A protein has these predicted regions:
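Phosphate-centric recognition/catalysis
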Residues: 4-25, 39
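Cofactor- and metal-binding active-site motifs of prokaryotic enzymes
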Residues: 6-11, 18, 30-31, 136-143, ...
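Conserved mixed alpha/beta catalytic, RNA-binding, or beta-rich assembly cores of soluble enzyme
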Residues: 20-81
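Structural motif
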Residues: 21, 32, 42-44, 87-89, ...
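Flexible, glycine/charged-enriched surface loops at secondary-structure junctions
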Residues: 78-86, 121-127
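Phosphate/ribose-phosphate-bearing ligand recognition and processing surfaces
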Residues: 95-106
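Divalent-metal-activated hydrolytic enzyme cores
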Residues: 106-176
C-alpha cells in the first residue's frame, strides 16, 4: 500500500478505491457492507440504515437497495465484470434495549437477498447483538477487522437514539 489511503464512512455514505485503501466505519444499529473484486483487488464499503427506499422517498445511500446498486455500478465502472469474482462481508446491526433491532434485521435480510440473487458470496458476517462495531476494511487484500465495543458515540445508534437524545437535552435544559 504505497499511498496509504483511508477514510471513515458515515451512515448513508459509500466509498470505494481502485488503489489500495483502508475504509473504516463505526456503526451501532446501522449495517456496514464491503464488496471486493478478488481478481482486480478493488473494493468498496457502504453504511446503510434502512432496508429499501419507498416510492415516496428520494433514493439515498441510507437505503440498502440504492447503496448496493450504486456500489455495484462503481465496481462495474472500475472493470469488475463478474459477480463470481466478487465477495462480500456484512457487519453491524446491533441494538440497545431492542431499539432498531427489527430495522437492522430487515436491512441484513435485504442485503442477503440481493447477494443471493446476484450470486455474490458472503465470506463473513458479524451482525446483531448489543454492541456497536468499529470496522476497518483493506480493499486490496480483503482483510477486515471488526471490533465490538460499547464505546461508540450515541449518534452511531441513530435514528432511534436521535429522538431520545433530543428529549434528554430538552429535559436537561428545562431543569436549568
Amino acid at each position: 500500500m504505497s499511498k496509504n489511503l483511508s477514510c471513515i464512512i458515515q451512515a448513508g455514505h459509500l466509498a470505494y478505491s481502485e488503489d489500495p485503501a483502508f475504509l473504516c466505519a463505526i456503526c451501532g444499529n446501522g449495517v456496514v457492507v464491503t464488496v471486493r473484486d478478488r481478481l482486480l483487488c478493488i473494493g468498496g464499503m457502504i453504511h446503510v440504515v434502512y432496508p429499501k427506499s419507498e416510492p415516496e422517498d428520494r433514493p439515498t445511500n441510507f437505503h440498502v437497495d440504492t447503496a448496493l446498486g450504486s456500489l455495484f455500478k462503481v465496481l462495474l465502472d472500475l472493470g469488475s465484470s463478474s459477480n463470481n469474482d466478487r465477495e462480500a462481508q456484512i457487519f453491524g446491526g446491533g441494538h440497545q434495549n431492542g431499539l432498531g433491532k427489527k430495522r437492522a434485521e430487515d436491512c441484513v435480510r435485504k442485503i442477503r437477498k440481493i447477494f443471493k440473487d446476484k450470486k455474490i458470496k458472503i465470506v463473513s458476517e458479524d451482525i446483531g447483538g448489543s454492541l456497536g462495531r468499529k470496522i476497518i476494511f483493506n480493499t486490496y487484500t480483503g482483510e477486515t477487522a471488526a471490533i465490538k465495543t460499547s464505546r461508540i458515540r450515541r449518534m452511531d445508534w441513530l435514528p432511534e437514539w436521535e429522538h431520545l437524545i433530543g428529549v434528554k437535552r430538552i429535559a436537561y435544559l428545562q431543569r436549568q
